Amino acid sequence: MKINIGDRLDNIILPSLNGSIFELKSTIGKKLLLTFYRFAACPMCNLRINDLKKNYDSFGSNFIHVAIFNSDLNNLKRFTKKHDAPFPILADQNFEYFQKYSVKRSLPRFLWSQIIRIDRQVKGIIKGYIPWTFKGHITTLPVDVLIDENGVVQIVKYAKDLGDHISIATIKQFTNN
């Protein structure tokens, strides 16, 4: 099912980078950015995590970002632990929630992204986010979902390319209203 404004998502239960089991229902009462990323070694995904981490304090204390990668936990630890992120990073090894919420894969859009987002790709690699292994679907297009304190979807963005996300400015506006 595709996520729409006004929806309430079912509970998502996945292993977290910190070793615990995360449940989406634990975020009720906070504003939330839920993002479905590609595989753990994705340079653009890791650059986005880095950007969110740098801006995290400006989102306010009643905000949480939840990052879901199509990866097994060991691979996720290998590529994302260095972030020391102040938010949960989850492993959906079996692509279960990606399928449930109609997260798309597209080879043409993947290839197009390699052209139009080459600057982000190179920046990610320069920062050390080098995709040595491809464990997970490389053609997955990200999805960002902003959810209010009551668990209701307010904004949803199904990406048109690998670097297409809700802007940091929009997240700040959402979290500070």
Residue ranges and their predicted role:
Residues 92-163:
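Thiol/selenol-based redox catalytic cores and closely related redox-interacting motifs
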Residues 1-25:
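N-terminal "domain-start" segment that seeds a small globular fold
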Residues 162-177:
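A short, polar/charged loop-to-alpha-helix boundary motif
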Residues 48-100:
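Structural microenvironment flanking redox-active thiols in thiol-disulfide oxidoreductases
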